[in-house]
């Protein structure tokens, strides 16, 4: 389970240097934090010269502190005409400052204050896990890994070109300087990666050497005689999967099939990295199927053990909010209504379980807290039968508005081919071809992304990616019906069903069914009646009035969700099932990174009821995988949504054989 984070306090020493009473040490030399950053970390890694002319450069730091190393590196990047196209800065921090604490410590930064204020504005809540923050229109990306280094470092997926080791003194914080950490850094190091640190402790150099670094002394900063610099050049091969250089794409062009939440998000993320995208959808515009409904809610999942779903949904919610804010900042608002979400238990036992989970997790109240029935009624007009989890950052939005904003943001980088059906796809000469029913090639590109939900198995072999169709029906209450029900909440309320606040036209929505897709997508009276029962359970004072409404006269929305075997999405590079089956005996003890993959073919599928949660983060994950960037999720979370996960399980259990592995069906 993820541990609750304990934020650092902005305390100064007698000399005016930021100080940690927890470690009884200062955050940087009394000679000055920025001067130390330039001398030790940039200079010790040969920056900015080392990134000159590069497409991508990745720095991994241990100990973010007040962020001076990041700010100094960002400023150096801005000032360098030979800078790399994209700078990635990945930093681990166990005790992050709050936004207010950073502002206090940054107050005297003078000409760097504008950058510091951008960092403060983007600063996340103290939630364990990875937080990706983008600056300079994506040219500079900060990925904060919040948590204990011994837990976080093994889960990072990145290829590092340089390391900043900036933990507190080894004598005060030994966990940051252990052999486990040094081996973890070596796992991430690209060939020739450099390293610098303020410390000159002999055991640090010895530990780095044992991990494959050529570590040596260098003249220290200020009054310190020595520091340590290193280069990764192991004399033996000990890594099963070594980081590789970022791919050098001759042509940045991708085909995306499906223009719902998944496909539009992928299109925008690829366009932000300089890709041209040809977007296909059989309908006459974006968000015409499952993503077409005019109101969808989003909040995180909470569990006492901080399960994979809980961690994924937390990451997805946080990234989505940042992504939508960035769209709004670029003049493309998505219409997000951050009214908050109240999630109540279906009964008192479930409510007690919610409270116990909340207490066990220790998450900040800015993310989730307990709300009593009295507070829900007085503050939000929600006459709920019991207390529940209050998500102040939750809310609702119209998915089509997100899709439209993303495509507008992509601009000329996207060629939308609406009303066009891709009949099949084919791999030829290192490119993917989208082909119509007459056999004509509609487009070709080195990358193809399947974002077309339950239609995907029609285009690619997916024997081991189990998906099913689940019907969902929302009920729309007309303005007069809402008035007849009495007080209506100004927030989203969820439990055994959900209801949304009143829309601008005075209507409100209640949902939703979750049933097998067994017929035409038309509204059913009995489902409207069931939704009214759900409403009565959420707002007991409205039960009598709801019982008087005529379900047969109701209108609403009907759609189909695409759901995986465990309700987690399928996001990542597609497995080559034929190759894996042919090599089945050798893959009995395999890991996901051992599974053969189809070159250039990716999936963004099975978002089920959490399209708002998965779409933006899933798109950033895919774009990062394609570009060879550090991933925005921990390795175990990436594995949890990998399209090859069921194939891996079948291989491990000996449940596949050569008789399955004929043609992949993707060439010819």
Curated annotation (Swiss-Prot):
Q: Which GO terms describe its cellular component?
A: cytoplasm
Q: Which reaction does it catalyse?
A: 5-aminomethyl-2-thiouridine(34) in tRNA + S-adenosyl-L-methionine = 5-methylaminomethyl-2-thiouridine(34) in tRNA + S-adenosyl-L-homocysteine + H(+)
Q: What is its EC number?
A: 2.1.1.61, 1.5.-.-
Q: Name one GO molecular function term.
A: tRNA (5-methylaminomethyl-2-thiouridylate)(34)-methyltransferase activity
**Region FAD-dependent cmnm(5)s(2)U34 oxidoreductase, residue ranges:** 257-668
What single Pfam family name could you report for this chain, choosing any that match? Methyltransf_30
Q: Which cofactor does it need?
A: FAD
Q: Which InterPro entries match?
A: FAD-dep_OxRdtase (IPR006076), FAD/NAD-bd_sf (IPR036188), MnmC-like_methylTransf (IPR008471), SAM-dependent_MTases_sf (IPR029063), tRNA_MAMT_biosynth_bifunc_MnmC (IPR023032), tRNA_MNMC2 (IPR047785), tRNA_S-uridine_synth_MnmC_C (IPR017610)
Give the source's domain of life in one word.
Bacteria
Q: What does the sequence similarity comment in the record state about its family? A: In the N-terminal section; belongs to the methyltransferase superfamily. tRNA (mnm(5)s(2)U34)-methyltransferase family.
Q: Where is it located?
A: Cytoplasm
GO BP: any one term: methylation
**Name assigned to this protein:** tRNA 5-methylaminomethyl-2-thiouridine biosynthesis bifunctional protein MnmC
State the encoding gene: mnmC
Annotated stretches, region: tRNA (mnm(5)s(2)U34)-methyltransferase: 1-233
| Task performed by this protein | Catalyzes the last two steps in the biosynthesis of 5-methylaminomethyl-2-thiouridine (mnm(5)s(2)U) at the wobble position (U34) in tRNA. Catalyzes the FAD-dependent demodification of cmnm(5)s(2)U34 to nm(5)s(2)U34, followed by the transfer of a methyl group from S-adenosyl-L-methionine to nm(5)s(2)U34, to form mnm(5)s(2)U34.
């Amino acid at each position: 389970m993820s541990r609750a984070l304990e934020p650092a306090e902005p305390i100064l020493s007698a000399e005016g240097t930021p100080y940690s009473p927890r470690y009884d040490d200062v955050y940087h030399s009394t000679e000055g934090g920025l001067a130390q950053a330039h001398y030790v970390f940039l200079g010790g890694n040969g920056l900015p010269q080392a990134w000159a002319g590069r497409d991508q450069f990745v720095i991994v730091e241990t100990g973010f502190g007040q962020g001076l190393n990041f700010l100094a590196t960002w400023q150096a990047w801005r000032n360098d005409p030979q800078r790399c196209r994209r700078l990635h800065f990945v930093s681990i921090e166990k005790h992050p400052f709050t936004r207010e604490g950073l502002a206090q410590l940054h107050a005297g930064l003078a000409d760097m204050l504008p950058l510091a204020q951008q960092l403060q504005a983007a600063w996340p809540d103290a939630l364990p896990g990875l937080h990706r923050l983008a600056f300079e229109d994506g040219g500079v990306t900060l990925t904060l890994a919040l948590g204990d280094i011994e837990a976080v470092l093994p889960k990072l997926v990145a290829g590092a070109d340089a390391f900043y080791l900036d933990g507190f003194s080894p004598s005060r914080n030994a966990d940051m300087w252990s052999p486990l950490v040094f081996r973890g850094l070596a796992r991430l190091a690209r060939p020739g990666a450099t390293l610098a640190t303020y410390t000159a402790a002999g055991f640090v150099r010895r530990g780095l050497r044992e991990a494959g670094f050529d570590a040596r002394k260098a003249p220290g900063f200020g009054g310190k005689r020595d520091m340590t610099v290193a280069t990764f050049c192991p004399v033996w091969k000990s890594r099963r999967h070594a980081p590789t250089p970022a791919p050098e794409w001759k042509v940045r062009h991708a085909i995306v099939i499906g223009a719902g939440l998944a496909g539009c998000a992928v299109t925008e993320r690829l366009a932000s990295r300089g890709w041209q995208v040809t977007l296909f959808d059989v309908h006459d515009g974006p968000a015409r199927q499952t993503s077409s409904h005019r109101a969808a809610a989003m909040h995180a999942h909470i569990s006492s053990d901080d399960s994979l779903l809980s961690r994924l949904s937390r990451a997805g919610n946080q990234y989505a909010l940042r992504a939508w804010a960035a769209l709004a900042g670029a003049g493309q608002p998505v219409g997000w209504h951050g009214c908050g979400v109240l999630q109540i238990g279906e009964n008192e036992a479930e409510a007690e379980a919610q409270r116990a989970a909340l207490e066990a997790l220790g998450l900040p109240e800015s993310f989730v807290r307990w709300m009593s029935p009295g507070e829900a009624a007085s503050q939000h007009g929600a006459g709920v039968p019991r207390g529940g989890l209050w998500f102040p950052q939750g809310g609702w939005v119209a998915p089509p508005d997100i899709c439209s904003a993303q495509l507008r943001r992509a601009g000329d980088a996207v060629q939308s081919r609406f009303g066009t059906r891709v009949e099949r796809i084919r791999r030829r000469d290192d490119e993917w071809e989208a082909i119509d029913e007459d056999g004509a090639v509609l487009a070709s590109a080195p990358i193809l992304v399947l974002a077309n939900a339950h239609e995907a198995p029609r285009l690619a072999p997916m024997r081991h990616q189990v998906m099913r169709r689940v019907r969902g029906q929302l009920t729309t209450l007309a303005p007069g019906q809402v008035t007849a029900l009495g007080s209506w909440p100004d927030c989203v309320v969820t439990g055994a069903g959900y209801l949304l606040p009143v829309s601008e036209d005075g209507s409100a929505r209640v949902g939703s069914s979750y049933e097998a897709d067994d017929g035409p997508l038309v509204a059913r009276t009995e489902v409207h009646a069931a939704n009214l029962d759900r409403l009565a359970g959420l707002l007991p004072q409205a039960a009598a009035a709801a019982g008087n409404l005529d379900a047969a006269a109701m209108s609403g929305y009907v759609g189909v969700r695409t759901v995986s075997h465990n309700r987690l999405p399928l996001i990542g590079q597609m497995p080559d099932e034929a190759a894996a089956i042919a090599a089945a005996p050798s893959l009995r003890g395999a890991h996901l990174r051992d599974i053969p993959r189809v070159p250039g073919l990716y999936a963004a599928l099975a978002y089920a009821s959490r399209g708002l949660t998965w779409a933006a983060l899933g798109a950033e994950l895919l774009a990062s995988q394609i570009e060879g960037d550090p991933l925005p999720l921990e390795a175990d979370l990436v594995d949890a949504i990998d399209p090859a996960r069921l194939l891996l399980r079948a291989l491990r259990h000996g449940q596949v054989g050569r008789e399955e592995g004929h043609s992949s069906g993707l060439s010819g």
